[in-house]
Amino acid sequence: MAVAMTPAAADELHTIVDLIRYGASRFSEAGLTFGHSYDNALDEATQLVLHALHLPPDLGPAYGQARLLHTEKECVLALFERRVTERVPVAYLTGDAWFAGLNFKSDARALVPRSPIAELIQAGFEPWLAGRDVRHALDLCTGSGCIAIAMGHYNPHWSVDGADISEDALSLALENKVRLLAHNVELIKSDVFAGLVGRRYQLIVSNPPYVTDAETDALPQEYGYEPELGLRAGPDGLNLVLKILRDAPAHLDEEGLLICEVGESEQQLVRLLPQVDFAWVEFKVGQMGVFAVECRELIAHHDPIAALAAER
């Protein structure tokens, strides 16, 4: 369904609020899929309007009645049309995304920044860190670098590594490191832990690929713009997660902690490893497939974890 600006739209849409309402209506009517930074049509329309008009994200409500020039309407409606007809995620249309209160560059080199781990970062990882003295932290499967850079931003005394197998993702992460002056973040190319020999951490955080093959094949069109490498994770979504569980103890201090997102693969992980004491994080909006687990717990159950990982 096209939403190109018609003469009627040019005549009847006058203000910022008019355009936001129009965009939200078109997005809802088109049955778009949300979840790439924003979870509803109104927020997506708002971000596209503000981006097209070069306005700040915290624009006061008084500006909502500001009238637009004809050329400004054209810019806004062109973005609306791409969102509807091409199903391009908003973050890829605007070129940026918010994560943990920070604005990151976003493009198809890496997944759009989104993870409930942002809430943990802004809460200082409490109560999970429980007073641990973190000096070195790792963001494994860093993608755009959003988790690593946010950890470094809110914990300037930490030394943070961001590791990823994708050179494309690391190039984007480097741009975000420069953009956000993340001087305490180092980016490393690594296939899981292979490029991190000799490095040890008090905290490892990971948002790895965890979407099953069947789910990946059935994802809405919006997800097709993202690199499949960051999504697909085998028949049950745990191919990479099990390797992380197996190898993390070699890179954690004895009292170290692993925090990992597995999304809807949570139930399968618990079914495979019922003996492991995973602490599932409760977020403000409920439980969302993120666990914390102690290094000693992974060591105690290394054999069954390693056996499962070897099957992948």
Swiss-Prot record:
SUPFAM superfamilies: S-adenosyl-L-methionine-dependent methyltransferases. Its EC number is 2.1.1.298. The keyword Methyltransferase applies. It catalyses: L-glutaminyl-[ribosomal protein uL3] + S-adenosyl-L-methionine = N(5)-methyl-L-glutaminyl-[ribosomal protein uL3] + S-adenosyl-L-homocysteine + H(+). GO terms for cellular component: cytosol. Pfam families: MTS. Keywords: Methyltransferase, S-adenosyl-L-methionine, Transferase. GO terms for biological process: methylation. GO terms for molecular function: nucleic acid binding; protein-glutamine N-methyltransferase activity. Methylates large ribosomal subunit protein uL3 on a specific glutamine residue. Belongs to the protein N5-glutamine methyltransferase family. PrmB subfamily. This is Ribosomal protein uL3 glutamine methyltransferase. It comes from Xylella fastidiosa (strain 9a5c). The gene is prmB.
